[in-house]
């Protein structure tokens, strides 16, 4: 099975899902396809953006740990994160990008991509949330951020929140999303 066939099939399924949601009166639902961490899986950032371009109600879930793993450790500076955000903005627009759905954790990877999620304190793995937090603030973004740390999600979510606030960010009411 080719990647092209897989992406076309995924797009067809998304279109059908949106049509069925509309028929059920759920036209206000947002669907967030996710960047996946293993090289052999459908779900590169470019593939997810291609899916999201078919309807305004599709917002990418950018798992920065997965992106870092797929790129063999590619997110090492604020500029690396800013480039990702700018690529998303040029693909789906600034306003949809401002409301991005984000997953974040440190990730161990191999040549096949993601191997294992780790905690924020496992500093031998990347990426660094501080780099992303600064870009989110600089671009006045209001993303939903989900912490996916291994065995420590609630505690690490609080650490991510504190990093964001200490970087100058402010928290937004949940009702302002989507």
Question: What are the residue ranges of the model-derived segments?
Answer:
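Short helix-capping segments at alpha-helix termini
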Residues: 21-28, 53-57, 92-96, 138-139, ...
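Active-site acidic/histidine proton-transfer and metal-coordination neighborhood
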Residues: 1-62
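Gly/Pro-rich active-site loop or hairpin
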Residues: 69-141
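A short, acidic, flexible beta-alpha connecting loop/helix-capping segment that sits on the rim
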Residues: 145-155
């Amino acid at each position: 099975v080719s990647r092209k066939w897989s992406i076309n099939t995924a797009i067809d399924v998304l279109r059908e899902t949106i049509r069925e949601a509309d028929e059920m009166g759920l036209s206000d639902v947002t669907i967030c396809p996710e960047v996946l961490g293993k090289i052999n899986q459908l779900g590169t950032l470019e593939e997810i953006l291609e899916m999201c371009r078919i309807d305004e109600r599709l917002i990418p879930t950018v798992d920065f740990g997965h992106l870092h793993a797929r790129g063999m450790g590619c997110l090492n500076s604020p500029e690396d994160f800013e480039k990702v955000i700018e690529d998303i903005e040029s693909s789906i627009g600034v306003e949809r990008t401002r409301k991005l759905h984000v997953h974040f954790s440190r990730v161990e990877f191999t040549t096949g991509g993601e191997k294992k999620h780790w905690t924020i304190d496992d500093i031998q793995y990347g990426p660094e949330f501080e780099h992303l937090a600064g870009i989110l603030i600089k671009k006045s973004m209001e993303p939903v951020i989900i912490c996916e740390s291994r065995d420590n999600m609630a505690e690490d979510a609080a650490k991510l929140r504190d990093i964001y606030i200490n970087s100058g960010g402010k928290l937004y009411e949940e009702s302002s999303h989507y």
